[in-house]
């Protein structure tokens, strides 16, 4: 058969039930984030596990994240790094950055994570060329194309690019005009599919995850 069974909600539930989930600390972090009115748009636990495996296979030591939110993904990714690994996470929203920094400080990987507060469009250019083994984008979708350009510069050969929300919050195939973020994702997906210097694929996990390798 040329066609495979489409991924359904049942598949997603099945996958999640057979993937390492959150520990007590991460569950507590999420509960506190909800009480602080931080939107529940962090990555899924099964997506976190998948990304951790990718980082371990890559032997990543330096990671850059754009979009800290509550710090959930930063902590997960940092846990996949060696003891001397380093993750720099960038967050524009001051309230979210403050919340994330407080919880990261309490985590078991506090010494591996640096929270940079401000606009990624200004912070990314200050980072050194070929200084990262992986870059994760999970911020404003209208900025993805610009962040991808910076990721190309930052990544070492064979470095990983990972980009969240390729399925546009479940609205990728919705008919008619959509809100700005959905249209931005649709546009970025076309850019990413043809981006020079990257070999990439969308993985149907979470809200869709772009995974690519920086080509020499």
Label each region the model flagged.
Residues 1-134, 141-162, 166-216:
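A short alpha-helical cap/connector motif
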